Each structure stands twice: as structure tokens, then as C-alpha cells.
Amino acid sequence: MKVKDFFKWSDKMQKEENRLMKVKGEEYTVSDQDKFKNFKSIGERMNLDAEQVCLIYLLKHMDSIRNYVLTGSEVSEEPITGRIQDARNYLLLLGGIIYEKQRKETE
């Protein structure tokens, strides 16, 4: 793939990831303004940090991506591109959770 084609594709992927983040995020914030509400709430119930909960969600997608890379087959109805977009979004969410935690520690 040529560099310009890669960045064109990358921009398209990032726009879709942002759209997915907004759409899916509404369901999980439970009408709260805290973007990480879902991870914190589950963490409290399971005695885990929000980062750990987010990592578990990420690893679920990574297992699916790993399976695709090793076998070349998609076993779910969601295409591999969707799994990659979800994994990238969970990495972004994890980064946000860590950023928020570090900011609170320095205040």
C-alpha cells in the first residue's frame, strides 16, 4: 500500500472509530457525564481498578484478532475490521483512564 493510500485509509478508520466511540459510549455511561463510568462501576462491583476492567474488554477483542491472524477466519458476525476498531478504541479509553488517574495523583 502506498503511503498516501495508507493515510487515506487510516483517516477513514479513525473517523469510524470516533463515530463508534460516541454511539457505543452512550449505552455504557448510563446517562452519566463520566466517560469511564462503566469501567469504574464494574470495577467497584468486581474489586478491580477501572484500568483492569478496560484491559479485560480489550483482551477479548485481542483474542478475536489473534484468532483471525492465526487461522484467517472470522468466527463471529462482526468483521475483523470492527474488532480492530474496537480494540483501538479500548486502547484509547485505557489511555484516558490512566491519564485521568495520573492527573488526580498530581493534584
Describe the predicted segments one by one.
Residues M1-E107:
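Intrinsically disordered, low-complexity regulatory regions
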